[in-house]
């Protein structure tokens, strides 16, 4: 199980929500199958629908 907090710790130099979405896509491409959102991203550009966007980024893998 991949946790959002793990992705954020592994990529601690991220400065935007868009970078987080790219990191999630990368994790999915590497074979991660399950994803849990255990924290809310605290970026200035984090949208109100951040959970939907994180899920979409993880499942799209594009």
Q: Which stretches of residues belong to each language-model region?
A:
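Metal-dependent phosphodiesterase/phospholipase catalytic core, i.e.
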Residues: 1-62
């Amino acid at each position: 199980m991949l946790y959002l907090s793990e992705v954020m710790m592994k990529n601690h130099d991220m400065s935007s929500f868009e970078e987080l979405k790219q990191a999630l896509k990368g994790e999915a491409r590497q074979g991660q199958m399950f994803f849990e959102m255990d924290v809310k991203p605290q970026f200035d550009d984090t949208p109100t629908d951040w959970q939907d966007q994180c899920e979409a980024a993880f499942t799209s893998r594009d």
